[in-house]
């Protein structure tokens, strides 16, 4: 994978104090020198079969990192006696676990008990973003896997789609993200879809009024009402690509400026004074958006990580050792 020079320079400049304090680039260069190549090749194969893997892995990485840190706690399967983060409401539709399993199996065959599941998620997400048209960027590695996975943590911590802009900025800010990072991470919705349960109130009964949300384009609201009349309906979060939302670009920001945001928080960032200027910058400059997204992803990947002797290296990403 070709790494763009601007990405390397900016990442070193902006996230060195955050990420490199505990993690390091090329962590597996001696212990498992082919690790990143193995991950990339398997992600490429999956992307060729299903380009929506970009959105799936980005969401998985987000949901893992913001609950107890990037420790692969989201990958743990529940047992008959113990639930896991997979049982949390926000995680019901998280997918991509089979690809992580496939990568882990390949790495265990070549480098047993060496590459953590949390690093696999981070690397696989990076590769999927690039394949989907997003930025290429380097990520430090050396994460270790956690020992705890509870649905209560995810239910309590992960933000709902109707969070306020103030709440969203506070959520990200508590993890070291600024407004540019926060809005850039929401830009991942350029490759996402949402089930009707996350937005149906905006098109049918906004805040109990019996009417659609006035901040939503009325033509879009009508189309979404039809979509949600069918059980199991969903919609592309980027309405510039309503059929195949798999192209990673800044068109999402232009859409929300035209009142075509699907999730409430997406629409709010386009109008709130705290974020609207950033939205305009990203809508006007695709390279700026991609550059900041790369920075934000590396910051996110360093949230509350376990390193050194903390945690473990799972041999099966779905179960503690």
UniProtKB/Swiss-Prot annotation:
Coiled-coil features, chain-numbered ranges: none
Molecular function in Gene Ontology: heme binding; lactoperoxidase activity; metal ion binding
Origin: domain of life: Eukaryota
Example GO BP: hydrogen peroxide catabolic process
Binding site for substrate: 159
Residues annotated for Ca(2+) 2 binding in this entry: 190, 238, 244, 249
Disulfide bond residue pairs: 32-111, 65-70, 117-317, 196-228
Catalytic activity: 2 a phenolic donor + H2O2 = 2 a phenolic radical donor + 2 H2O
GO CC terms in record: extracellular region
Signal sequence region: 1-21
Chain positions recorded as Ca(2+) 1 binding sites: 64, 67, 69, 71, 73
UniProt-annotated site: Transition state stabilizer, residues: 59
Enzyme Commission (EC) number: 1.11.1.7
UniProt family annotation: Belongs to the peroxidase family. Classical plant (class III) peroxidase subfamily.
Other facts: There are 73 peroxidase genes in A.thaliana.
Stated name of the protein: Peroxidase 28
Organism, as annotated: Arabidopsis thaliana (Mouse-ear cress)
């Amino acid at each position: 994978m070709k790494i763009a020079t601007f990405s390397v320079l900016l990442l070193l400049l902006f996230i060195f104090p955050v990420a490199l304090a505990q993690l390091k680039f090329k962590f597996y260069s001696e212990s498992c020198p082919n690790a990143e190549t193995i991950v990339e090749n398997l992600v490429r194969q999956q992307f060729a079969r299903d380009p929506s893997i970009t959105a799936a892995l980005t969401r998985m990485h987000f949901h893992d990192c913001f609950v107890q840190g990037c420790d692969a706690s989201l990958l743990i399967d529940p047992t008959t006696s113990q639930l896991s983060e997979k049982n949390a409401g926000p995680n019901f539709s998280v997918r991509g676990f089979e690809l992580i399993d496939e990568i882990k199996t390949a790495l265990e065959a070549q480098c047993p008990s060496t590459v953590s599941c949390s690093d696999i998620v981070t690397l696989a997400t990076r590769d999927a973003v690039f394949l989907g048209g997003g930025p290429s960027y380097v990520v430090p590695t050396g994460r270790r896997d956690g020992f705890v996975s509870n649905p209560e943590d995810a239910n309590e911590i992960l933000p709902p789609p109707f969070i306020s802009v103030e709440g969203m900025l506070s959520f990200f800010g508590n993890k070291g993200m600024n407004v540019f990072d926060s809005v850039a991470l929401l830009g991942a919705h350029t490759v996402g879809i949402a089930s009707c349960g996350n937005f149906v109130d905006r098109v049918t009964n906004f805040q109990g009024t019996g009417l659609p949300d006035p901040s939503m384009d009325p033509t879009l609201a009508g189309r979404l009402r039809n979509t949600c009349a069918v059980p199991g309906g969903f919609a592309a979060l980027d309405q510039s690509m309503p059929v195949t939302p798999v192209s990673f670009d800044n068109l999402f920001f232009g859409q929300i400026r035209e009142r075509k945001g699907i999730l409430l928080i997406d629409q709010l960032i386009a109008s709130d004074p705290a974020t609207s200027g950033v939205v305009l910058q990203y809508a006007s400059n695709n390279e700026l958006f991609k550059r900041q997204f790369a920075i934000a992803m590396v910051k996110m990947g360093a949230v509350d990580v376990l390193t050194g002797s903390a945690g473990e290296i799972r041999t099966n990403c779905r179960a503690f050792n």
